[in-house]
């Protein structure tokens, strides 16, 4: 975190129902729209909550039980979209990917209306919220909702994807996804929580209807604020929707956002920090911010070339590098990725990001976002080399 941003966090929290705070919030919205390349008529709303809050809000404000969604599930956060659909009873099919594998045309082809992903479409049409959706779906043993029929005969209305599946470090091909959604007239919802600012994002060009991000990744702020950016047609759809939620009803956020406010008390301090951070990015330039992160990622990946790790992602984001240890312990057992995290934390004062679930012992992740330098990269590499010399890798 930048020192200037940290100092703002130490200041007293002001009362927020004021013209001054409203002006700050409207600037936050304007800059978020600009950095997402959202286009004319786009709106950004800010929720006090985690990225998961924004994921759930997006799904329940855009879709109902009369829709059928396609969900890319390549890891923990794709599975989170699946779980949201299950909880709210929204029919879905999931495209399951092996950890570390990229999304390809072959994965999408069975779900295409025409079965042909090779032709460009001139625009994205409104699919309608209840077009030709079956209601005889059942749930198989895996928890996946399915009608039991060939997926190519189903009428899908929406597509949910984490553009960067943070748990495995895979960045999906947005050009491919964009083309598929246009050809099949799907509402496109994108979680860009860990990708925003680290990788190029072209909301309007790609026909993304809604994109969400959080304060704690490349914005390098405390966790607690989620931003949801909607294009013009999504704003209209949200305003016409009926949502059975008080806190997650985005209609209220849109209405209050017109005057630079939120319907409920927000994390005021983080929003003030966000304002200065967005201004700093504007001063540096969006491309400059992205290039800095990219350079850090490339520098780290070059420096670890001789260490006993494998980069497990087929399609990397600049935000992080997912590493699988390839070494063996003295007893012949594989080196634990989680144990590497613990040793770095406890003995070297360095934090990398561990994984959970079945990847906990197999993969850890090194981030390149936030207030980091090439010297920080070198410090981590030196620690890993020392661990290697100690026989810990």
What are these regions (language model features)?
Residues 1, 216-299:
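Active-site C-terminal subdomain of aminotransferase-like
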Residues 8-54, 80-86:
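Conserved N-terminal alpha-helix of the aminotransferase class I/II PLP-enzyme fold
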Residues 31-35, 278-312, 343:
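Conserved PLP-dependent catalytic core of the aminotransferase class-I/II
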Residues 63-79:
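Conserved PLP-anchoring active-site segment centered on the Schiff-base-forming lysine
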Residues 103-121, 150-195:
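Active-site phosphate-binding strand-loop segment of PLP-dependent enzymes
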Residues 204-216:
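Conserved active-site segment immediately N-terminal to the catalytic lysine
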Residues 310-347:
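Conserved PLP-binding catalytic core of the aspartate aminotransferase-like
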Residues 358, 362-393:
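PLP-dependent enzyme catalytic core of the Aspartate aminotransferase-like
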């Amino acid at each position: 975190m930048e020192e200037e941003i940290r100092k703002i966090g130490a200041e007293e929290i002001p009362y927020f129902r004021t013209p001054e705070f409203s002006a700050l919030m409207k600037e936050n919205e304007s800059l978020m729209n600009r950095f997402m390349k959202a286009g004319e008529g786009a709106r950004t709303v800010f929720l006090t909550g985690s990225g998961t809050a924004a994921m759930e809000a997006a799904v329940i404000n855009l879709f109902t039980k009369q829709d059928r969604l396609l969900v890319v599930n390549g890891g923990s956060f794709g599975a989170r979209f699946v779980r949201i659909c299950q909880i709210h009873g929204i029919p879905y099919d999931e495209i399951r990917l092996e950890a570390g594998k990229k999304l390809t045309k072959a994965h999408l082809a069975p779900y295409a209306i025409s079965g042909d992903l090779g032709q460009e479409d001139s625009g994205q049409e409104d699919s309608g919220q209840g077009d030709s959706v079956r209601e005889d779906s059942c749930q198989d043993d895996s928890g996946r909702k399915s009608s039991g029929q060939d997926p190519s005969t189903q009428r899908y209305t929406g597509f949910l994807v984490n553009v960067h599946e943070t748990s495995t470090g895979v960045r999906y091909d947005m050009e491919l996804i964009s083309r598929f959604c246009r050809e099949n007239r799907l509402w496109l919802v994108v979680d860009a929580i860990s990708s925003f600012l680290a990788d190029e994002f072209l909301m309007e060009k790609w026909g993304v209807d809604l994109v969400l991000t959080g304060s704690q990744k490349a914005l390098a702020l405390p966790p607690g604020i989620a931003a949801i950016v909607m294009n013009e047609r999504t704003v209209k759809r949200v305003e016409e929707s009926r949502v059975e939620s008080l806190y997650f009803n985005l209609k209220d956020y849109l209405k209050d956002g017109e005057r630079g406010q939120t319907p409920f008390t927000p994390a005021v301090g983080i929003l003030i920090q966000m304002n200065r951070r967005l201004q700093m990015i504007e001063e540096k330039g969006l491309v400059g911010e992205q290039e800095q992160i990219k350079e850090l990622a490339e520098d780290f990946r070059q420096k670890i070339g001789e260490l006993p790790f494998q980069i497990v992602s087929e399609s990397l984001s600049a935000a992080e590098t997912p590493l699988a240890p390839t070494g063996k312990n003295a007893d012949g057992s594989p080196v634990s990725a989680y144990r590497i995290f613990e040793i770095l934390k406890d003995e070297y004062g360095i934090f990398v990001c561990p994984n959970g679930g079945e990847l906990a012992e197999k993969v850890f992740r090194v981030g390149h976002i936030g207030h980091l330098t090439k010297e920080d990269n070198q410090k981590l590499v030196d620690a890993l080399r020392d661990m290697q010399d100690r026989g810990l890798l």
